[in-house]
Amino acid sequence: MISQKLSYGDVPTSASLSSLSPGLAPPYVNGMGCMPAQPYPNLYSNNMVAGGSCMGSPSVGYSPPSTMASCMGGAGAVPYGSLPREQEAASPTSALQRARNDKTYRRSYTHAKPPYSYISLITMAIQNNPSRMLTLSEIYQFIMDLFPFYRQNQQRWQNSIRHSLSFNDCFVKVPRTPDKPGKGSFWTLHPDSGNMFENGCFLRRQKRFKDEKKETLRQAQKAQQTHGHHGGSHDKRGEHGHDKSAPPGPGEDKEMRDELLAQLHAAPELCLPEHTPLALEHYAQLKQEPSGYAPAQHPFSITRLLPGADTKADLKMYDVNYGYGHSPADNYYQSPLYHHHHAHAQPPL
């Protein structure tokens, strides 16, 4: 009978073992028909043995909760905390969790760039000094002590600090006095700059301060530079012989006169050669001064471009002698000058 009941896979069931007398029951079977988690040669794992031993046959019926608890207690359900240290160390999740528990997670902003402009940093340094005056090196030191970010790349941001001090009217350079010897001048805030930052917040200025005196000087220098630029252009034109105040020489006078005559008369028949007898006679007639002639009323007056007064009169006489006499501006289209140029402007058919 015992051999038949134990022949199923060599695994004793709780029903067959419970039918045995207490004296014949093996020592590893308890009184409630449960087996503790002990190694068994024909089982795959200890957990399977525990599960199989705790499951009773249909003939046994429902076990009380206390019995089930005792059975589960003996089944070998090991909690996470009692795992071996080797298995816990092998898990990457547990290693990450242990690292977070060992070190308090807190993000540090000490080495981040502060959200302040260089003007704000300089104002902070000056206002935090009792004398309200600091040298350039003291401003550097204050910024580096307050913000560790500026302990690196010192040359770059220190150049920006010097630029801000020099080109902002809110900062004033104060020379040293005999009672304060040392190197370098002091820097302070302008008395009229007022409170540039709202409620002590240095993130943004309310308005940009401008010194009226410095602004006036800047405008005057700007106007002077503009005037000097135009004066230089006039001097450059004077080098080419157009705006010279000194009277030109004989050779230059003749050359400029020929050039102006060529510009006035585009028609080839009016440009006379200078070495012909007709040209000599023409130059003699230019010396005659007409009566009642007003050069400024000529429609083609170029008095501002001519080098000398004598040449101006000669050229105006030339216009009169060749039919370019006085004609008002409104009668220009009825004058012979317009018809003459209009005839030459039309292309030949």
UniProtKB/Swiss-Prot annotation:
Residues 82-103, 212-255 are annotated as: Disordered. PROSITE patterns: FORK_HEAD_1, FORK_HEAD_2, FORK_HEAD_3. Pfam families: Forkhead, Forkhead_N. The keyword Mitochondrion does not apply. One of its GO terms (molecular function) is RNA polymerase II cis-regulatory region sequence-specific DNA binding. Disulfide bonds: none annotated. Gene3D superfamilies: Winged helix-like DNA-binding domain superfamily/Winged helix DNA-binding domain (1.10.10.10). Regulates the transcription of the sericin-1 gene via interaction with the SA site. This is Silk gland factor 1. The lineage of its organism: Eukaryota, Metazoa, Ecdysozoa, Arthropoda, Hexapoda.
